[in-house]
């Protein structure tokens, strides 16, 4: 807006004339003509700014300087404490006027004005605290910790101060703390509690007290533990105890934005990290909505009681609703998604959009509304430096606000405000509304509430349960179990809403009885975790999705019951989106390497693996991808985990024993891991290699180990980490029997001994296994050396007669010992024409032809091996196409069996018969009559 004196509404002209006349009286020079437009806008927008210029005439030249630079901060003389209040207040008034000037001149947008107000408050806090600390040190001494380091007060800023988005005339929410107890060492010694409490009270008074120069900042200390009844300053230990025992839901919202703003900032930020589990729960936490409902109800009651309907902060569609909406979504998901742990609202809003929790168009609307409301809020407060959020009732004030913001009149501004408030109200109501969509009590709900005394098998039969008596008994047993009986009233109310809805969903599933059994198993597991009951209560769509998954997959039902954190995945928008690629999965896994606590890091890695494999299972179950893709992804995930675990183990070894200078270590994946065809729950076939440089006989740490022991210890650590049981389960079972000499051989083979073994002593079946082997983790140069050894081993000339005889003998032995097929069912893996027949065919082709066709040495996975053998002429093109289809069919059926916890013994169907026939025909054509 460009408002020149000639553009003023007639009604505002007298006000501006009086303002400019007042200013002219105190200036030694006439008002420069080029400043008149901006001073006109200032006169319309702010009595406070004009009053400040009248009191500090020299300020005008500073504001008019190019770029409107900051006003130098005052120096608070320790010898003149009586001057401090005036110095702080005059500087704050000057800097606040500068904020108004920059806003009106278009130098700052809304976000910059909020940041400027925050910085000003922090600077005033810092100046005041530093001066008071010197005074206290002279009078009372200092309080040192056990190492003799002086302690400082820690000042936490909450609310908008913590978020860096302070409005123009806001109070500042402060909480005082200190690291440790103790006593000061001065002539008038004080205990730490008294020392820091007095210091904090003096700080608040120095900033807050109104004098002839006004005030610096209004200080609110009521957000401290126990509120106004609590101690003014608490030790970190006392703060910890409070939040462990007394912390309430609304305090999670308050401390979400907390930031150390003065004093010992480093200590404060370190302590805030310890508070993070209180603010952000480890799992999706829909109980946060309960706290939000309580706070919103209290605010609504206050608005009604105090007739604050014109309040743009607390009223409907106001600033507070945007803040609550973002903070609630942050609290729900921030424990799982670090990107959401953000103090700044606009940054948090962007993160919520990026995480899929707010639609992009809704995020844009909320951003626009927030900036609109904050700009209006600032202008209301700039008028007279008043902490107000209420629209003015005075006609002249209304016109000043509207014209100052660039609107033709108040009605136009009011209409724009109403539009923004409606947007906010709609979004906020949607957040709190989901449970209202659940059906009113019906027959199934009344039946559940009658248990365990009641019984109504006919009702369950009518609802669709085949074994109605069994379902009735299961529900009665569940209702009278200690888990249900020990629920709090609030949790029981949630269960009473959730369980009937689950029953309805079960009756609509293809297998109602199985769904009910699995639902009750899951509920039994989560009864003590009210956050999961809250999730199902607040999110009916998740409830329906849950029952659908439980009905179709016994494996996922077991995993959900064992690890309820997977319920989070049902609400994750990514569960229906594309899977991350191998690099993306590695990046997700390696986030744990930044966690200092090894136990927490391992648990997080387990949770990451669980979540990613769950998403793969869901994609497979829903038919969004075939088993070939899923098994490849599972192998890539396993490799990412192994790489991460190796890094953890190496860090542990280096910390304890140092490293082997110039030494190399690598992990080779065999079997399904090497062949990129891993199943759900498959173990990992691993072989460990090392290469130790000549002349190095020990590690270089404080507790050195000779190289052989060092590498063995490293491999053992890798295996221990992969197999360790955590709250999120274990990563993988490990099989190391494919190493040279099997169980009798060394756990870690040197590259030289491995090379010699493959050249001189390995059996044919071991060379078959080598076809799918590939390096998965460790030193890149050693992995390259392994590839060379593998190529030399597989690519040598062979006696095909001996090769075929060995392969047929081994396959016959396996068929006899492992095939579980019967007259009606086929063992998908070991049966005639099954997966192993196909693997043996391909492995034989590689061993027989790679001496002449080096390209056969590159692929490891079945589809690529089929293609390569077709190019090499080992398989006709038509046969290769048939084998691709057969492989996909058997893998799809096998993975479906795994997902439903059925053995991979499948009733023969036309598709399975066709697949087996194709594999059997290909084997016979290659002179490998396995069947």
UniProtKB/Swiss-Prot annotation:
InterPro entries, per the entry: GlnE, GlnE_rpt_dom, NT_sf, PII_UdlTrfase/GS_AdlTrfase
Q: Region (Adenylyl transferase): which ranges?
A: 441-931
Q: What is its EC number?
A: 2.7.7.89, 2.7.7.42
Pfam families, A to Z: GlnD_UR_UTase, GlnE
Q: Which superkingdom does the taxonomy of this entry point to?
A: Bacteria
Keywords noted in UniProt:
ATP-binding, Magnesium, Multifunctional enzyme, Nucleotide-binding, Nucleotidyltransferase, Transferase
Q: What PANTHER family does the entry give? A: BIFUNCTIONAL GLUTAMINE SYNTHETASE ADENYLYLTRANSFERASE_ADENYLYL-REMOVING ENZYME, GLUTAMINE SYNTHETASE ADENYLYLTRANSFERASE
The broad enzyme category this protein falls into is: transferase
Under the GO molecular function aspect, what terms does this record hold? [glutamate-ammonia-ligase] adenylyltransferase activity; [glutamine synthetase]-adenylyl-L-tyrosine phosphorylase activity; ATP binding; magnesium ion binding
Q: Please list the GO biological process terms of this entry.
A: regulation of glutamine family amino acid metabolic process
Name the gene for this chain: glnE
Protein name as catalogued: Bifunctional glutamine synthetase adenylyltransferase/adenylyl-removing enzyme
Q: Please spell out the taxonomic lineage of the organism that makes this protein.
A: Bacteria, Pseudomonadati, Pseudomonadota, Gammaproteobacteria, Lysobacterales
Q: Which family does it belong to?
A: Belongs to the GlnE family.
């Amino acid at each position: 807006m460009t408002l020149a004196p000639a553009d003023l509404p007639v009604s505002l002209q007298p006000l501006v004339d009086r303002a400019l006349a007042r200013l002219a009286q105190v200036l030694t020079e006439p008002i420069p003509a080029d400043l008149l437009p901006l001073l006109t806008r200032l006169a319309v927008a702010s009595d406070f700014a004009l009053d400040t210029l009248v009191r500090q005439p020299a300020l005008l030249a500073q504001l008019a300087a190019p770029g409107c630079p900051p006003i130098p901060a005052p120096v608070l003389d320790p010898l003149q404490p009586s001057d401090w209040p005036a110095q702080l207040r005059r500087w704050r008034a000057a800097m606040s006027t500068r904020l108004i000037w920059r806003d009106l001149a278009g130098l700052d947008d809304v976000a910059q004005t909020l940041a400027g107000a925050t910085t000003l408050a922090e600077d005033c806090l810092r100046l005041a605290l530093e001066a008071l600390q010197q005074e206290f040190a002279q009078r009372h001494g200092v309080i040192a910790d056990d190492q003799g380091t002086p302690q400082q007060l820690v000042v936490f800023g909450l609310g908008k101060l913590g978020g860096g988005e302070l409005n123009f005339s806001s109070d500042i929410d402060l909480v005082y703390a200190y690291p440790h107890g103790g006593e000061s060492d001065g002539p008038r010694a004080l205990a730490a509690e008294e020392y820091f409490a007095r210091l904090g009270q003096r700080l608040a008074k120095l900033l807050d007290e109104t004098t002839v120069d006004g005030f610096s900042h209004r200080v609110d200390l009521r957000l401290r533990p126990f509120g106004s009844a609590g101690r003014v300053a608490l030790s970190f230990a006392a703060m910890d105890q409070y939040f462990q025992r007394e912390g309430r839901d609304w305090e999670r919202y308050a401390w979400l934005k907390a930031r150390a703003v003065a004093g010992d900032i480093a200590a404060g930020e370190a302590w805030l990290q310890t508070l993070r589990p209180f603010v952000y729960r480890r799992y999706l936490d829909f109980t946060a909505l309960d706290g939000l409902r309580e706070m919103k109800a209290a605010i609504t009651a206050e608005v009604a009681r105090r007739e604050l309907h014109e309040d743009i902060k607390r009223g409907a569609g106001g600033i507070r609703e945007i803040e609550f909406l973002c903070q609630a979504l942050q609290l729900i998901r921030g424990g799982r998604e670090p990107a959401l742990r953000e103090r700044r609202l606009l940054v948090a809003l962007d993160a919520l959009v990026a995480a899929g929790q707010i639609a992009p168009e809704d995020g844009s609307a909320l951003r626009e509304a927030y900036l609109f409301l904050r700009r209006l809020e600032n202008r209301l407060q700039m008028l007279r430096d008043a902490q107000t959020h209420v629209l003015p009732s005075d006609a002249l004030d209304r016109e000043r606000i509207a014209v100052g913001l660039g609107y033709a009149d108040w009605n136009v501004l009011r209409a724009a405000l109403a539009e923004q408030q409606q947007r906010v109200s709609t979004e906020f109501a949607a957040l709190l509304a989901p449970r209202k969509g659940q059906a009113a009590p019906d027959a199934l709900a009344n039946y559940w509430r009658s248990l365990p005394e009641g019984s109504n098998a006919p009702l369950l039969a009518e609802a669709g349960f085949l074994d109605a008596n069994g379902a009735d008994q299961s529900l009665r047993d569940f209702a009278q179990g200690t888990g249900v009986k020990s629920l709090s009233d609030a949790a029981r109310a949630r269960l009473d809403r959730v369980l009937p809805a689950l029953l309805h969903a079960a009756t609509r599933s293809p297998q109602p009885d199985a769904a009910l059994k699995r639902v009750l198993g899951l509920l039994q597991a989560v009864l003590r975790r009210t956050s999961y009951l809250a999730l199902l209560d607040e999110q009916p769509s998740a409830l329906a999705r849950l029952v659908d998954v439980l009905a179709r997959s016994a494996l996922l039902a077991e995993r959900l019951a064992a690890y309820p954190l997977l319920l989070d995945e049902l609400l994750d928008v990514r569960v229906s989106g594309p899977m991350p690629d191998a690099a993306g999965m590695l990046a997700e896994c390696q986030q744990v390497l930044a966690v200092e606590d090894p136990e927490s890091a391992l648990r997080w890695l387990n949770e990451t693996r669980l979540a990613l494999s769950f998403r793969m299972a869901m994609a497979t179950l829903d038919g969004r991808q075939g088993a070939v893709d899923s098994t490849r992804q599972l192998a890539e995930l396993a490799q990412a985990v192994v790489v991460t675990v190796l890094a953890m183990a190496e860090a542990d070894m280096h910390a304890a024993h140092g490293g082997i200078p110039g030494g190399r270590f690598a992990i080779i994946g065999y079997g399904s891991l090497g062949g990129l065809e891993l199943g759900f729950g498959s173990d990992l076939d691993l072989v460990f290699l090392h290469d130790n440089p000549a002349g190095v006989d020990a590690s270089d740490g404080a507790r050195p180990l000779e190289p052989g022991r060092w590498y063995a210890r490293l491999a053992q650590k890798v295996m221990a980490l992969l197999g360790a049981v955590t709250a999120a389960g274990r990563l993988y079972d490990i099989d190391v029997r494919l190493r040279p000499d099997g169980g009798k051989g060394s756990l870690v083979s040197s590259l030289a001994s491995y090379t010699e073994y493959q050249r001189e002593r390995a059996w044919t079946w071991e060379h078959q296994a080598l076809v799918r082997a590939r390096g998965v983790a460790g030193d890149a140069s050693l992995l390259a050396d392994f590839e060379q050894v593998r190529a030399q081993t597989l690519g040598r000339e062979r006696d095909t007669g001996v090769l075929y005889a060995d392969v047929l003998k081994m396959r016959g032995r396996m068929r006899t010992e492992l095939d579980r097929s019967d007259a009606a069912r086929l063992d998908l893996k070991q049966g005639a024409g099954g997966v192993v027949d196909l693997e043996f065919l391909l492995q034989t082709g590689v061993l027989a032809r790679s001496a002449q066709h080096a390209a056969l040495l590159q692929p490891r996975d079945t589809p690529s091996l089929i293609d390569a053998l077709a190019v090499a002429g080992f398989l006709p093109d038509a046969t290769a196409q048939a084998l691709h289809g057969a492989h996909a069919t058997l893998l799809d059926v096998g993975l479906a069996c795994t997902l439903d916890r059925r053995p991979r013994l499948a009733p023969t169907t036309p598709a399975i018969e066709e697949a087996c026939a194709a594999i059997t025909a290909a084997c016979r054509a290659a002179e490998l009559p396995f069947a």
